[in-house]
C-alpha cells in the first residue's frame, strides 16, 4: 500500500488590539519580514474609498449580500460598525491554511475573540498601546 503524507497546515496568526495601538505598523513589519505570509482580505458593506481595489483592499458587498453570508455561516468573525458590516471570509482563510499557507488577520479584539471560538488553534497576539501622560 502506498504511503501518503498529509500536507502540513499553515498557521492562522491573529493580531488584535484597540484602534491606534499599532496593529497596522506591526502587521506591515511582519508581512515585510515574511513575504510568503498571506494577508486575509476583509469583506465590508461600505463604499470603496479612492484607490481601494476589490479583492485587495476589501471585498465590497451590499448589506443584503453580507447578511445572506452571515446566515450561511461564511465568516470567521464579523461585526457591524456604525452602519456598515465588516468580516473575515471563513472559506478563503481556512482553504489557505489547509493548503499549507499561513494567514495573517489584523482585527479588533471582539473579532479576535470570535475567531478564537471558531479556530482555537490559531496564534493570537494582543497589542497594547503605549501609556501616555
PLM segments and residue spans:
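Conserved phosphate-donor/acceptor-positioning beta-strand/loop module used by diverse small-molecule
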Residues: 103-108, 117-133
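Extreme N-terminal, non-catalytic leader segments
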Residues: 1-13
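Post-Walker A helix-loop "phosphate-sensing" segment adjacent to the P-loop in P-loop NTPases
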Residues: 32-40
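ATP-dependent small-molecule kinase phosphotransfer cores
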Residues: 42-103, 109-113
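Post-Walker A alpha-helix
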Residues: 26-27
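Conserved lysine of the Walker
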Residues: 23
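P-loop (Walker A) phosphate-binding loop of NTP-binding proteins
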Residues: 16-18
